[in-house]
Amino acid sequence: MFAARQLSAPWTLCPSTTEADVVREWLTWASVGMEGVVFKRLNDVYRPSVRGWQKYKIRETSEAIVGAITGSVAAPRTLLLGRYDGKGRLQYVGRTTTLARAAGAAVAGLLARGRRGHPWTGWSFSAGWGSQEKLNVTLVEPELVVEVGVDVARDASGRWRHPARWHRARPDLSPADVPRLTSPPR
């Protein structure tokens, strides 16, 4: 089909296997873009809008700097995360899923409302992937480092493609300790 229709990027022919050892090998390929594997019955066909297959995503933990929040400083709902690029600019890399009440309470005491000159002043953030709706955010001082669980999937600018999952605050780290964004947004 690929040859007959002369399909090329962004189309990708995905390999398949029934061998567990092959799957384990594929799961080591995150550095070259492997996001995970999809499990399905051998005789199952793709059906739009039907959830019959399961995806196992490769995840890792990583640190990021909190630059903004949704909710209030006293009760944050989600964290907007950043990393410094090679030019020392704080760039947006992703947002967490909704925080559990206990996590929000733990973070609240570590946040300070953003001051004049915040690196994200004037920026707008989308409410979701592909959404035109703007997210209502409160800027906070980019001083708090957090550890999050993230999919290895990144977009072309280096941002996490899927929401990050809160793990913990890292008051033992400073923003300078967070890995730099290696593919800065254009």
Residue ranges and their predicted role:
Residues M1-R186:
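Catalytic cores of nucleic-acid ligases and guanylyltransferases
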